[in-house]
């Protein structure tokens, strides 16, 4: 798994993808930081974190679009699938590579917290709790998009489908309120990512929210392993 992880991580920095994702994330987080903290003279990062929820849904598909689709396009997937490394290790190696880049993106919020501390007293407990929520959210979305990437050999298709899925997640909270059928509304609310993420932005650390994101992550990684397993024996 270590070799897969190192290969994946170096691949991000040997291409433009890693730099583009970092640049876009830093740009929007910096923009929101200026608008909601400096411009409004506020010590709270809550609105910054809240708005980054929507940005994450669209940059992660770009980050993960090449994980398996590029392997299929270049016909290197068969060598990977027949290697002595287990399919689970392959999937985890690629997942951790993408998550490391995402973690570097999220680390900028620690810098923002330090900057605020020069002028006011930031609520570090809320900042760290929300940062944990953003990392858990990223884990789930990365796992989902890696699964999407395993289904196609086109990076563009993987990115577009991933963004479409992100758009559905972004609008699910609003859509669930418009559904007249109560049991459907209940289900939509229970799978609404924003509901679970919002609790973190209030500094509320709930085991239910943590389990939700970890479960989604594990489920999509499991699905990805099953896709690769079927391809190995086909």
List each model region and its residues:
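Transmembrane helix boundary and interhelical loop/hinge segments in multi-pass membrane proteins
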Residues: 44-48, 63-81, 95
């Amino acid at each position: 798994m270590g070799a897969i992880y190192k290969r994946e991580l170096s691949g991000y920095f040997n291409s433009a993808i890693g730099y583009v994702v970092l640049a876009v994330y830093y740009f929007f987080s910096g923009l929101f930081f200026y608008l909601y903290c400096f411009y409004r003279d506020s010590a709270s990062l809550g609105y910054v974190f809240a708005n980054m929820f929507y940005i994450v849904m669209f940059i992660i598909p770009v980050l993960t679009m090449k994980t398996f689709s590029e392997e299929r396009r270049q016909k290197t997937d068969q060598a990977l699938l027949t290697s002595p490394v287990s399919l689970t290790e392959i999937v985890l190696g690629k997942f951790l590579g993408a998550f490391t880049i995402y973690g570097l993106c999220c680390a900028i919020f620690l810098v923002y917290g330090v900057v605020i501390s020069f002028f006011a007293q930031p609520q570090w407990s809320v900042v760290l709790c929300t940062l944990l929520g953003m990392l858990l959210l990223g884990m789930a979305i990365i796992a989902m998009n890696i699964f999407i990437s395993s289904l196609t050999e086109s990076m563009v298709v993987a990115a577009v489908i991933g963004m479409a899925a992100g758009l559905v997640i972004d609008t699910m909270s609003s859509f669930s309120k418009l559904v007249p059928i109560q049991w459907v509304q209940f289900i939509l609310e229970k799978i609404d990512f924003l509901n679970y993420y919002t609790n973190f932005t209030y500094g509320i650390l709930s085991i239910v929210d943590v389990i939700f994101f970890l479960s989604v992550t594990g489920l999509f990684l499991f699905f990805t392993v099953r896709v690769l397993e079927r391809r190995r024996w086909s």
